[in-house]
Amino acid sequence: MNQEKFKKINKACFLDRDGVLNEDVGYLHKSQDFKWIDGAVEAIKLLKKNNFLVIVITNQSGISLGYFASKDVTNLHEWMNKILKKEGIQINDFFFSEDLPNNNPE
């Protein structure tokens, strides 16, 4: 087995947002409603310390329902990284879907 080949591979951890990193308050899109789940920031620190890429994935059906805009979600994610930067860490990327739970995306 070629060990050098594996040294170049990135490790990644994909985390859901609501209910994993923050308390699920329903249709979260404002920083003032955001509350970290106990241990979430520490878990991200541990992942980063062990050279993992940290990627957040989340379904944001509130966009399709008209409760908020995709820019609101992007702003919240930027705010999350601003808070994490104070802890010396960052989430590498965020991805979200606007689909409703029973929708069949194409």
Task: Enumerate the language-model features and the residues they cover.
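HAD-like aspartate-dependent phosphatase fold
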Residues: M1-E106
